[in-house]
Amino acid sequence: MKLKFTKMHGAGNDFVVLDGIHQQIDLTPAQWRALASRHFGVGADQILIVEKPTRPDVDFRYRIVNADGSEVEHCGNGARCFVRFVTEQGMTDKRSVRVEVMNGVITLTLQDDGQVTVDMGAPELEPARVPFRAQGLPTHAEGADALYGLEVNGRTEWISAVSMGNPHAVQVVDDVENFPVLQDGPVIEHHPAFPNRVNAGFMQVVDRHAIRLRVYERGAGETLACGTGACAAVVAGIRRGLLDSPVRVHTHGGELTIAWDGGAEPVRMTGPATTVFEGSIDLAALPA
């Protein structure tokens, strides 16, 4: 059986996008991993699946599978690629679509200049809802934010815990390019305080409207950009009194713009979404 796909990226965060409405998709975890493999498959940080919605008030259902075969709640860069995909494939003529994700609904808008704006919803800051086990950890306040001390490779690192539909631990560092992201990232990802694992963000403040960001993504490792990670970092920075909205987020893959008015207001992310190529892959070539 041949599986049709489209290869896309959002600021270098790359995806295999599958139309699950017009073709049957039923892959094993091993097949998901092989499809995402840069040696044995197409290669991607994550795989995005377009499906029919399960509720009447949305246009599509949006599923995300990590490179390790695990399914996750949300991906902001993927959401931008999602709306470009359904538009380019003629699956909708709307410029703005409502999309069902694992734990809610998001709104995606294709702008006239080709950029895509995603209404990411309000951030979740209550530890139990991140989810994050804060009990017993050292803590102190900075601005309106609570910082928690995690033991990481023999050091105590202070993080903010934020959910943007998926969990994030955000840490402010002086020099993000020379910070040991590849060493600390997996330790934070698997820290027992995060029962569902966590995306680890490392943020350097440039000025009150700009940051540099690296993210070690849960189930994918360090990626060139992470949309939900950019949102979580800006939320944490604003709450700590370090940033003012809007904020330009510089990643290795490109620039995103994040706006948030605080409190229960939604976070809005704007950035690029690029189609690279289309193809098909023989599922028989993938391990079962």
Swiss-Prot record:
It is found in: Cytoplasm. NCBIfam families: DapF. InterPro entries: DAP_epimerase_AS, DAP_epimerase_DapF. Catalyzes the stereoinversion of LL-2,6-diaminopimelate (L,L-DAP) to meso-diaminopimelate (meso-DAP), a precursor of L-lysine and an essential component of the bacterial peptidoglycan. Pathway: Amino-acid biosynthesis; L-lysine biosynthesis via DAP pathway; DL-2,6-diaminopimelate from LL-2,6-diaminopimelate: step 1/1. Pfam families: DAP_epimerase. Its main location: cytoplasm. Gene3D superfamilies: Diaminopimelate Epimerase, Chain A, domain 1. It comes from the Bacteria. Substrate binds at N13, Q46, N66, G76, N77, N166, N199, E217, R218, G227, T228. The active site is at C75 (proton donor), C226 (proton acceptor). Homodimer. The gene is dapF. This is Diaminopimelate epimerase. SUPFAM superfamilies: Diaminopimelate epimerase-like (SSF54506). One of its GO terms (molecular function) is diaminopimelate epimerase activity. The record marks H168, E217 as: Could be important to modulate the pK values of the two catalytic cysteine residues. Its EC number is 5.1.1.7. Belongs to the diaminopimelate epimerase family. It catalyses: (2S,6S)-2,6-diaminopimelate = meso-2,6-diaminopimelate. It comes from Cupriavidus taiwanensis (strain DSM 17343 / BCRC 17206 / CCUG 44338 / CIP 107171 / LMG 19424 / R1). One of its GO terms (biological process) is lysine biosynthetic process via diaminopimelate.
